[in-house]
Amino acid sequence: MSQLVDTKKLSPSNQVIFNIMLRKAKIEDAQAIQNLICFYSEDGKMLFRSLEDIEQNIEDFRVYEKSGEVVGIVNLKFGWDKLVEVRSLGVDPRFHRQGIATEMVRDAIEQASLNLDCDTVFVLTYAIPLFEKLGFQIIDKINLPQKVWNDCQQCLHQGNCDETAMSFSLLPFRKVSVINDNNNDEVLIPQ
């Protein structure tokens, strides 16, 4: 499996390049984010998001910037029974096949792993090979909690979902310490 990028190990000059390329979205990015979402939502490949919704949730977006232009987007939605969803993943078609989506999913995994309340990343996707190469496993949609499906009410494919559910466990990436409790049982403590 591919390694996640540790920006602390990059030289200072490379950190600047990396942070410019793949970074937390800013409010100024909202229109560019919506433009990519609109492109993919026109044919039902992504759920439409209003500009207002994007602006209200801008802190949950990451963008891939190339030459000052937002060419890739991804959104993480936290809050379901230790699950985090990778959603609104899209790359400007002019920049397809350059590894941008791969880097964005790796970054999303890394961002999700920083939240100790999350054990699993999941996605509903058409891009099965992309997620498989990054270690995601196909799962039955029925295993996802019902509240996950709230966003699907506005989907063109509601009631006949043709996306594949996939998941990725964050637990192997957690740093833990093993201690003995009062019963001399080993207990894992996240660090």
Language model features with spans:
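Cysteine-cluster motifs in flexible loop/terminal segments that predominantly coordinate metals
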Residues: 149-163
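Short, high-confidence coil segments that cap the C-terminus of an alpha-helix
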Residues: 59, 117-118
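Conserved active-site alpha-helix within GNAT-family acetyltransferase domains
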Residues: 125-151
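Conserved acetyl-CoA-binding loop-helix of GNAT-fold acetyltransferases
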Residues: 91, 97-112, 123
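A short helix-loop-beta-strand connector motif used in the catalytic cores of GNAT acetyltransferases and
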Residues: 53-67, 159-162
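Short amphipathic alpha-helix that is part of the acyltransferase structural core
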Residues: 4-48, 65, 163-165, 172-191
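Conserved beta-strand in the GNAT
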Residues: 63, 69-78, 82-90
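Conserved hydrophobic beta-strand within the GNAT/NAT acetyltransferase core sheet
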Residues: 118-124
